[in-house]
Amino acid sequence: MSTILESLPTGQKVGIAFSGGLDTSAALHWMRLKGAVPYAYTANLGQPDEDDYDSIPRRATEYGAEGARLIDCRAQLVAEGIAALQSGAFHISTAGVTYFNTTPIGRAVTGTMLVAAMKEDGVNIWGDGSTYKGNDIERFYRYGLLVNPDLKIYKPWLDQTFIDELGGRAEMSEFMRQSGFAYKMSAEKAYSTDSNLLGATHEAKDLESLESGIKIVNPIMGVAFWRDDVQIAKEEVTVRFEEGQPVALNGKTFPNAVELLLEANRIGGRHGLGMSDQIENRIIEAKSRGIYEAPGLALLFAAYERLVTGIHNEDTIEQYRESGRRLGRLLYQGRWFDPQAIMLRETAQRWVARAITGEVTLELRRGNDYSILSTKSPNLTYQPERLSMEKVASTFSPRDRIGQLTMRNLDITDTRDKLRVYSQVGLLAPGEASALPQIKGDKE
């Protein structure tokens, strides 16, 4: 039997992830009028553009919800965000500027916690506002079924009857007005925004055109650093980690990780740190474009990676980064709690993050322009005296280096022989301007 319901299950409990926006408000009221028994579940993810969470369940009840609950997901969201940071679970970047997978992390938390709450209420049918072309429909599907194997999925936006009756925002707004609700449709923006405490995503509409840039976006977690009239003073900030956990900013500790990240957001946001413009591949392999904000995570990650490079050896760092890219893709695909993701994540947390203790001081300027001013850690393996150009006691002598270089003759000879073979069979034919050695067919 299919887990996807294409028509409204009348007379049954239907849970809906309720944001309080026009789409979910109209869908909830429509479901009630059509004979379903809707239950509304709202995730408090610390969205920077939401200032009245307590009113959302009340509105859901007014629109016809049989029950409405507000689920505080902030602690879990920050915990998963720090886990992603510790394991470098970020696979999308452009010219070294990173997208911190803030929406996929939010979906992992929302999908599991809301369905768990529904299960407590005996609600085994779930709907949300994700569209069939996006990533979220698959993410929510996977996380929901992981928590509740008996779950059925009903999405009004996949129901042709709903689409025919309320297919657009104008129709939804008129439907709510005719139902007696003073619902005023908000002004249409040039793009769509989704956010949580970790970061914000701006996409769709005008941003679908690559001719439209970051300058049309109004940041909600930071400042428009590209504007000449925005004054941004440079600022020094010190980040302290203990065993992979961020614990202090500028010497100040916090009662919990949520409060620390909020302060990191404020500091990074003052500079527009962590904003990026990315072209990415959705789960269905179609390319999309997003402009992202993540000021707090960007600040913490800059300090964390500095300590990683000062503490761990080259092979460990290489493994951390390769595994992080793979883990980031799993996270993006809605597989954050799959066994292969847990293995990669916990390996990094144990063998990389646990050694990360120390302080990094940065100077923040505009956007992603910053400098590292100081790095301190009791675990540093960076020892400048080993390679000092001054006359100091050395761990190896010039004669030692002569011997080491002499041993390289073996692989240099092997490389030269291979290049000669490639040249003979026509695989190697560099032009005159090439720096590649002109290996001839005959030995010299």
UniProtKB/Swiss-Prot annotation:
One of its GO terms (cellular component) is cytoplasm. Homotetramer. Pathway: Amino-acid biosynthesis; L-arginine biosynthesis; L-arginine from L-ornithine and carbamoyl phosphate: step 2/3. The keyword Nucleotide-binding applies. GO terms for biological process: argininosuccinate metabolic process; L-arginine biosynthetic process; urea cycle. PANTHER family: ARGININOSUCCINATE SYNTHASE. It catalyses: L-citrulline + L-aspartate + ATP = 2-(N(omega)-L-arginino)succinate + AMP + diphosphate + H(+). L-citrulline binds at residues 99, 135, 139, 192, 201, 203, 280. It holds the Pfam family Arginosuc_syn_C. L-aspartate binds at residues 131, 135-136. It is found in: Cytoplasm. Transmembrane segments: none annotated. Belongs to the argininosuccinate synthase family. Type 2 subfamily. It is an enzyme of class 6 (ligase). ATP binds at residues 17-25, 43, 129, 131, 136, 194. It comes from Paraburkholderia phymatum (strain DSM 17167 / CIP 108236 / LMG 21445 / STM815). This is Argininosuccinate synthase. The lineage of its organism: Bacteria, Pseudomonadati, Pseudomonadota, Betaproteobacteria, Burkholderiales. Its EC number is 6.3.4.5.
